[in-house]
């Protein structure tokens, strides 16, 4: 199979996009785990105490909120740049 066939195969493109999304999600989970572990875990034990559990829950929620805010902001920036470039070409 030649590379042009790969570039135009919609099923392959969809598969690649799905795998890329999975990879990005795994990277996000890894990053979130690392950040929250460093922030909340004083010393590993046989089970989490309530303070540590609350810290993890809050950390994960803030991490998700922050990630969503950044994604929304990037989308707004891209839309405004697209609208700006369209007005420049008219």
Curated annotation (Swiss-Prot):
UniProt keyword ATP-binding, yes or no: no
Statement: the UniProt record of this protein carries the keyword Mitochondrion: yes
Source taxon at top rank: Eukaryota
GO CC terms: mitochondrial inner membrane
Biological processes, Gene Ontology terms: protein transport
Keywords per UniProt: Chaperone, Disulfide bond, Membrane, Metal-binding, Mitochondrion, Mitochondrion inner membrane, Protein transport, Translocation, Transport, Zinc
Membrane topology: Peripheral membrane protein
Motif (Twin CX3C motif): 36-59
InterPro entries with a match to the protein in the record: Tim10-like, Tim10-like_dom_sf
Cellular compartment(s): Mitochondrion inner membrane
Cystine residue pairs: 36-59, 40-55
Family: Belongs to the small Tim family.
Domains as described in the record: The twin CX3C motif contains 4 conserved Cys residues that form 2 disulfide bonds in the mitochondrial intermembrane space. However, during the transit of TIMM8A from cytoplasm into mitochondrion, the Cys residues probably coordinate zinc, thereby preventing folding and allowing its transfer across mitochondrial outer membrane.
The protein's assembly and partners: Heterohexamer; composed of 3 copies of TIMM8A and 3 copies of TIMM13, named soluble 70 kDa complex. Associates with the TIM22 complex, whose core is composed of TIMM22.
Function: Mitochondrial intermembrane chaperone that participates in the import and insertion of some multi-pass transmembrane proteins into the mitochondrial inner membrane. Also required for the transfer of beta-barrel precursors from the TOM complex to the sorting and assembly machinery (SAM complex) of the outer membrane. Acts as a chaperone-like protein that protects the hydrophobic precursors from aggregation and guide them through the mitochondrial intermembrane space.
Name of the protein described by the UniProt record: Mitochondrial import inner membrane translocase subunit Tim8 A
Organism of derivation: Danio rerio
Name of the gene: timm8a
């Amino acid at each position: 199979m030649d590379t042009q066939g790969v570039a135009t195969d919609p099923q392959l493109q969809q598969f690649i996009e799905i795998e890329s999304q999975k990879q990005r999600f795994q990277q996000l989970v890894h990053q979130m785990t690392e950040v929250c572990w460093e922030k909340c875990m004083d010393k590993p034990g046989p089970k989490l105490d309530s303070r540590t559990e609350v810290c993890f829950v809050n950390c994960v929620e803030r991490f998700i909120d922050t990630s969503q805010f950044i994604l929304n902001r990037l989308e707004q920036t891209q839309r405004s740049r697209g609208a700006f470039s369209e007005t420049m070409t008219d």
